Amino acid sequence: MLSHRRVTQIVLGLTIVGAVAWTQTPGNIFTAVLGETGQRTAEVSTEELRGILAENRAVVLDARPHLEFAISHIPGALNVAARPGVPMSMYVSDVAEVGRLVRGDKGRPIVLYCNGPHCGKSKRLAEELLGSDYTNVRRYQLGIPVWRALGGVTEIELDGLRHVLANDRTAVVIDVREAAAYHAGTLGSARHLPRSGVLEGKDVGEVRRAKDDGRLPMEDHNTRIIVIGQSVDDARFVAEALTREAFHNVAYFTGTFQQALAALQP
């Protein structure tokens, strides 16, 4: 029969082995956070943010300037104006505007994000919100760069679309309407990738053909890709399919093709 001391030694040994095994378990990048010290607001992971957005459990606030938000933002995120009188180098959103957004409910859950680990905008806004007695503020400090890197699609607003088409000659616009509609007229030099030809899976259907014939920018996967469809749902479906093909700067337009066309008329 084992002595009490021997049993204790065995249990202790198993505990140590278990602890070592636990510490050696590979991490999941989707549950990772930056883990900075000295911050008064907690972080959320990419997985947590996806759940928050899916279940509408918090106000997700893009802490960047409006044009940057309009060009590319996490779907479902909101944006408010800058605090007046602040230089761009120290940009911070206006707490008063946040108050109007949440209708004065300072206990409402808020998640902030900006341009990733080295961006200070969400940290500055978090501090100002805490100083104004907000009690439920967290940050997705990994920000939009990591969101994209992990296969997250983004949205582009109408004013962002105008800006990109006027200023970014490298951007690729994808029109996902069916052939008859596309050939009847499209936006400038938009390329055709019909929604009906985009299949589940990787390297299949029309997406594979678009890779091979040059419609998709295979020699620079960082190229800005904007997807526009007959409906927002069609555009988002194709945009999400493209992110699964390792294109990580993909945005879909938040309106219809007709809305984009009307707004872009001279």
Language-model features: locations:
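Rhodanese-like catalytic fold shared by cysteine-dependent sulfurtransferases
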Residues: 2-47, 55, 69-112, 116-172, ...
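Primarily extracytoplasmic ectodomains and periplasmic/lumenal surface modules that are beta-strand-rich
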Residues: 59, 67-68
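Structural scaffold elements adjacent to functional motifs in cytosolic proteins
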Residues: 60-62, 173-175
